[in-house]
Amino acid sequence: MSSALLAVELAYWQQTVIRALVGLVAVLLPAGTLVYLFLFKMMSFMQSRLGPMEAGPYGSMQLLAEVGKFLQKEDLVPRAADRIVFKLAPFVVLISTFLLVLVIPAGPDLWFIDIDTGIFLALAVSSISVIGVLMAGWASASKYSLIGGLRAAGQLVAYELPLVLAVMGVVIQAGTLNMQGIVMAQATGEIFGWGGIGNPFIITQFVGFAIFIVAVQAELTQPPFDMPVAESEIVTGYLTEYSGLRFLLFFIGEFATAGIFAALAATLFLGGWYVPGLDPTSNLFNVIGPAVLMGKMILVAFLIFWFRFTYPRFREDQLQQLAWKVLIPLALANIVVTGVLKVVL
C-alpha cells in the first residue's frame, strides 16, 4: 500500500499544501521556540540573571508553559468590536509569517517552493502583516488600539521600502531573484577575484545588510521601534483588547517572524545553508544544511535582539526621518555602486 501511495502523482496544489503543512511543523514552530528561548536567555544574561529555569531542563520548555498559560485565559471580545474582523486579525498576521517560510531553502534539494521570483514573493508576503495589524486596531473599538494600529501601519509602510531596496543590491550581484540561486551565487562567487570562501554577500553588501537589519527591526515593531505597542503611551497598542488564544497567536507570530526574518537575512547575506570550502552540490548539505541555516539564523537573531535591549525608543518623527532621510538614500546609493561594479568587474 505504501509503495502504491508513493507512486500516486499529486497535483501541484496538493504538493504545495503538504509542503506548507510540513513547513509549519518542521520549521516555523522550532524557529519560534528557539528564538523565544534565545531572546529570554540573552535578555537574562545582559541583565546579570539566569532567566527561565523551572520549565524543563534549563528552561527549555518555557514556551510550552507560556502557551498553556494563555490557553487557560478567557478569550474576551469587546462589546463594540467588529467580532469577525477582530477574530480574523491574528490569523492574518500569522499567515504572513507562515508564507515567508516557504521560500527559504535549507539545502540543495530541501525547499518547499522553488520559484524564479522567490525573493519577490518573500518581500510581498512580509507586508501582509500590515493588514492584520490594521484589522486588529480598527476592529477593537478602542482608541488605544486604533492609534497603535495606525502607528504600526505608518511604520511598516515607511520601512518596507528600505527593506526592498536593501535586497535589490543582493539581487543585482547574484543576477537572480531565486532564493536557491542567491545561495549558489554566494557559494560559487568570488570577492574581487578571490574565491577561497565564495562570496558571502555580507562582505560586498555590508551596507545592504545593515539597512536590512534596521528595517527588519522596524517591521517587527521591537525596541527601539516599538511605538505601536508603547506601554507608557497607548497601553499595548493594537494588542490592548486581545487575550487568551488570540493574544497567543500574536505572541507566537512576533517571535516566529523574528526567526524567519533572521533566516531570510542568513540566506541573503550569509550564504544560507552553505559552508565555505565544501562542494555546494554535495548531498552532505541535504543533511547538515538545516543545522547550518539554523546556526546562522541564531547569529542574526542575536544581532536583532541586541538592538532591542540596547537602544531607547525613538520618537515618531525620528523614526520617519531615519527611514526617508537616511536609509532610503543609503540603499539607493548602494544599488548604484553595486550596479556600476557589476558592469565594470
For the regions a language model picked out, list residue spans one by one.
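Selective transmembrane helix interface/packing segments
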Residues: 2-345
